Amino acid sequence: MSDRLEDSALMLRYRDGDVAAFEVLYGRHKDSVYRYLLRLALDAQVAEDVFQEAWSRIIRARDQYRPTARFSTYLFRIAHNCFIDHVRRNRRHAGAEELDAEKMPATDDEPDRVTERLLARERLGVALMNLPPEQRDVFLLREEAGLTLDEIASVTGTSRETAKSRLRYAVGKLGTAIAGNGQAPKRQSGESTA
């Protein structure tokens, strides 16, 4: 066994009172969970609020934790549910914040390359905002969280085939949008969000 303890073993240790085990888990997963929520919520304040709530739920529910799935699946399910709860409470959420070029890290790349990357990132952000929420969620669970289709299905409460279909539609729409003008095709009335 490697020196790196499995996440589920760390959570079990935390359940038994080992706070240092929780600190390791938090350190491993905080960035990916926050990125997932930020891209899902499209609002930094909402993402931060939901992020805090998700970790609070992990802490409060530690005595009930059972390692029936990967810890990351458990964690992203809680984060997903916290976001859904937030949306239900607020019935709306704001759009993404504008990219601030001054916050971007400096690079030694040629200015044209930097500009090209910034524009591509902006097109991706716009395209993500234009995806139906179900497709955006599945895409982010795959790309940000690195979950498998089975894990995505578990997190979203859908079948594997539904998760696969939503991912396929999302990737197709994002590819079209990034190659084109940055706008994901708008849904037609009656179009499935599969």
Describe the residue ranges of each PLM region.
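N-terminal module of bacterial RNA polymerase sigma factors
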Residues: M1-S32, M129, E151, G190-A194
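C-terminal edge and immediately downstream basic/flexible tail or linker adjoining helix-turn-helix-like DNA-binding
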Residues: S2-D3, R13, L42, A94, ...
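Sigma70-family region 2
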Residues: R15-D16, R39-L42, E53-R70, R89-N90
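Short, charged helix-capping/linker segments at alpha-helix termini
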Residues: R15-V24, Y34-E53, R160
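Amphipathic, Lys/Arg- and hydrophobic-enriched alpha-helical face
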Residues: Y26-A44, A61, L128, K173, ...
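Hydrophobic-face residues of short alpha-helical interaction/recognition segments
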Residues: V33, L37, R62, L75, ...
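DNA-recognition helix of helix-turn-helix
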Residues: T73, H80, I84, Q135, ...
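Short, basic/polar amphipathic helix motif occurring as a linker/hinge flanking DNA-binding modules
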Residues: H86-T107, T115, Q183-R187
